Amino acid sequence: MPLLHLQREKQTYGYFSPERFVNSQGTRTDEIAMNPAYFAVCPPEEIMQTLCHEMCHLWQHHFGKPGRRGYHNKEWADFMEAIGLMPSSTGAPGGARTGDKMADYAIEGGRFLEAYESLMTDDYRISWMDRFPSREKLMAAIANGTTDEMAGDLSIMGLAGISVEDGEITFEPGERPNKSNREKYTCPLCQRTFGASLA
């Protein structure tokens, strides 16, 4: 049984890491990490696709023959197709089925969409999101319309930098949260700027 982990790894929706964790008895378990920074800016279908993509890596690690680290081989691609996800280097039809950096898309009438549609009802949804999503990802999601179906949820959740009015999502520029452990100060006498630790 893998450990499901939320991790803000830059430029990745998720990843699989075999035998990443160990308990006090020495038992090892695998890790599937999901990036919560994308939860507010990606449709739920895409988030579930990422989880299934990583679960295919988990399956291959235990029951198949994984390629070299990071490589998505034919066996993995065949298993993805079997569960209803088409591997694609571009994330769209026509992309390569194997390679180092791979995306995927749902196959119409496939097992993934069937399971997704039965799971994602009014009673079930991804109900927690990062309140401070990446500005770049947020603006791109608003521009290409991927957040449209989530307008109601985004409005209720009060995400920083997002305004929703009559179903219309807009980006509000504002101050970014201070992610460092330092605060910037300016000397009133000499006007020099310096940093001081917040701790």
Go through each PLM region and give its residues.
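Hydrophobic (often cysteine-bearing) scaffold residues that line and stabilize catalytic clefts
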Residues: 44, 48, 52, 72
